[in-house]
Amino acid sequence: MSSWYDAWADRYGDWSSSVTADVPFYVGLARDADGPLVELAVGTGRVAIPVAQATGRCVIGIDSSPAMLAQARVRAVEEGVELDLREGDIRELEIEEPAGLIYCPGRSLLHLPTWADRRRCFERVAAALRSNGRFAWNAFAFDHHVASAIDGQHADTPLPHTNYYSVSDNRVDITLDDGGTGSLWWATKNEWLGLLDVAGLRLEALYGGFAGEPLDDDSREYIFVARR
C-alpha cells in the first residue's frame, strides 16, 4: 500500500487542499484532549499541521509511506509546527506514553483489507490510549448504489485512474493508469461497532457529518468518537 501512496504523494496536496470539512472537527477533539495526540495515516500532514497549530502541541503522526512523510516534514517546517513523524504500520501501533487522543481522518481505515486487520488496529489503539482517552475516525457510509455507479469510471485527477467495484467484498479498487492500485474496503455501521466491542472501546458519538449532524439514511459519512 505504501508504494501506491508514494505514487500519489507529489499531487496529493493539490487534491486534498479542497478537503477541509474534517479539520475543525479533529482540531476540537485535540483541544479537549489530555495527553499526547496521535494521528494514524498522517499522510502529508493535511490535518496534523492545523491540529498542531491550533493546540500549540506536537502531534505524533504514523504513516507507511516514506514519500508522504517526507512531504509532511517539509510542510511542518514551513508552517513552524512540531510533528513527530514515524514510518510504521497502524496495525502495529506503539507509543511511549498513553495518548489522550488517537484519530484517523481521511477515511484511511478503509485501506485495511480485512476485518482482522482492523481488529488488530483497534486493539493496538485501545492499548495505546490512556483511561478515558478518545479514538476518532471517519469513513464512507457504505452505499452499494454509489459504489456501483462509479464502477468502471475513469478520472484524470488527482492522477489518471479508473474505479472498479467488487460486489463480493464491498471493495473499490482505484487503479492508476500506470498500473498501481489502491483499494478501499467499505464497512457497515455494525461492523465498526463490532470492532469497538472486541477492542474494549465504548462508543461516545456517531455522527453523519462533521458539524455533528445526526446519522440518517441520507448520510454519506460515518464520524465515530469512542473512548477507552
Language model features with spans:
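C-terminal lobe and adjacent flexible extensions of AdoMet/dcAdoMet transferase-like proteins
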Residues: 189-228
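A conserved beta-strand element that flanks and buttresses the S-adenosyl-L-methionine
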Residues: 103-105
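SAM-dependent methyltransferase
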Residues: 136-197
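Class I SAM-dependent methyltransferase SAM/SAH-binding core
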Residues: 48-92
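Conserved class I S-adenosyl-L-methionine
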Residues: 1-43
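A short acidic, Gly/Pro-enriched loop at the edge of an enzyme's catalytic core
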Residues: 94-101
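A short glycine-rich, Lys/Arg-flanked "PGG" loop and its adjoining helix->strand segment in the class I
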Residues: 119-131
